[in-house]
Amino acid sequence: MQTNKQPKQQFSEKQFIAFVFNYIAGFGFISVVMTMFDVGPFSYLVLGLTSFAILGVVLSFSRLSVLCGNSAYGGSYLIAKKAVGTNSKTKRFFVFLSGWNVSLTGSFNGVVIPAVLIFSFADIPVVKANNNIIIGLLVGGFLLFGLLTFISLFGLKINKKAIFYFAVIKWIVVIGGFILGIYLIGTTNGKGFVENNLIGTRENIDFFKIIFISLALTIAFAGTEDLASITPDVKSNNLRKCFLIAFGCVVLLYLVGFVIISGLDGIRGYGLALGNKDPKAINNYGSIYRLVGGVPLLVIYGLGLLVNSLASRLSMTITTARKYVALAQDGFLPSFLAKTNKHNEYHHAVLISNLMTLLVMLIMVIIPFLPDHNNNNNSLFNAIEQLVTVTIEMAAAISLIQYFITFIFFFMIFAKKENQKLIPLWEKVSYVISFALVSVLLFVPLFPFNQWTVFNTFKIVVLICFYLLGVGFFGYAEWKNKNKYQLMNNNS
């Protein structure tokens, strides 16, 4: 029987910390870490700037989790309600905009799933060169997407078990790469530690390149804004501690991984005769496996990347569905989205979440048909790679928009006299610095007037269209519920 009651809490504190750590950390970092060394010694600056910016976001979410509590879904959406209230149309619009924006991140991140089989085995030459293999892997990716949608309908209890088993394989591959990396460092006597920390012949190291690489690194922290939306499922009286412990573990892992990888020789072909086409070039994390064990180890890596993507999508479905639930409970979206099935899962919200992802996929298909000077040979693999790159950049932009909005609401809440005493001076300073960093990382790449391409225009147009879709839902909700907003005020 369907119901819209609140499901019982499914996570203990330890389980939630592990869920947060597994949700954020892993392949997001290793997929972009190689690009950090394009700026030589400034790679440390990139890691520091990005980590500090996200730390401010985590601190704000953890601080607000104390103030707003964990009795309802919504995360940053609840923060917006706390900051401005819902007693006027303008206030309700900004509250809805916050909730709608954060719900888009899962849809854009989910686009990568059908392509994951291709990238899992991309280091095998025959995969890139054979369009039939690429199409077959793409079809397999869509079948996996459907399977994950089916699994996610069985509630957190089943999802937690699936995520756990997927996570075990994922971390074997990640840590295995670190160990193999140490082995490779030994074979070159640590040459990379010097090579990767010199500017040398690297070209065009400037402010914009550092900012763009920092933006790419925010992908390694993707999902931070999602996790506040599932706090009602956590049995904890100290969510702030949970967030900070998990984030500390993520940063520690990244620091260890960064130090190890910085010792590798030939990252992205630097210093090699044939550049990134040299057989010894380490162009991605899978190259570490290939250099040590050839194709057999590379296949193991590919399976690990695949499993990680499956776990990420399951986790993403859990968080994204609950964002729709919060909007539905307040009348902005149809009320049936707040109903649960016999497994205590918001099955309608899960299905809508995946339908939104499919909608994004259909729109992103336009990308390969846009003029691209880097794909003159019309390679199918390069076209899919460009599609995924642009989509991930859009997902990163949406996350940064959410951080930006949340900071504004955060400052509004703690500008009130009764809340000012809750925050020590050092924490206030960190928020201001983090807000400045988030602003730079958001607006400079989104409007790179010195390097504008057709892809920048495409990204902005698509984002505007999705926001207009949200405005349509808001307008309909205003018309339908114009006499019912007292219910929302009672929940504010």
UniProtKB/Swiss-Prot annotation:
It is found in: Cell membrane. Pfam families: AA_permease. Disulfide bonds: none annotated. The keyword Transmembrane applies. Signal peptide: none annotated. Keywords: Cell membrane, Membrane, Transmembrane, Transmembrane helix. InterPro entries: AA-permease/SLC12A_dom, APC_superfamily. This is Uncharacterized protein MG226. It comes from Mycoplasma genitalium (strain ATCC 33530 / DSM 19775 / NCTC 10195 / G37).
